[in-house]
Amino acid sequence: MAEIVTETERLHLRDWGEGDADRFYAIMNTPAVMRWLGGVQTPETWDAALQRILGFRRDYGHTFWIVERKDDGKLLGFCGLKRVNSPGTDLTGQFEVGWRFREEAWGKGYAKEAAIAAIDLAFGRFGAPDLLAFTVAGNEGSWGLMERLGMARRA
């Protein structure tokens, strides 16, 4: 079993374990979930993204962790931390919180609950001085969550 990084009232945030990548790809690679993320991914594109996710854990000790519901172990998505990699900007190296949840988990407060846990880890365990989140124009779901988390729009 993969190590549980933190937990909330309803959720476990844990490291990626055996079989998670295939399960995640199968349930998350839908037109609705991927709408704001460039569209449905090929297996090759997903594998490259997974290697980046696992690399965050290796390089920084944090990543986008698997989010499971405590009561039944259902994989709901991921949420966690990475470092910004935007060469040529002053953002590179800053902490970023991010999330992706399966469609049936939307609107139930899971993303906010997981994001609060990840933010607590950013400042508590990992010593983040600041924290960023990004989305694209039009993604009102993510914008709304950022605002409910107390984040301020910068652009």
Locations of the language-model features?
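Catalytic-loop Lys-Pro-X-Asn motif of eukaryotic-like protein kinases
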Residues: 137
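Conserved acetyl-CoA-binding loop-helix of GNAT-fold acetyltransferases
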Residues: 99, 107-121, 140-148
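GNAT-family acyltransferases
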Residues: 1-104, 116-121, 125, 130-134, ...
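Conserved acetyl-CoA-binding loop of GNAT-fold acetyltransferases
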Residues: 147-155
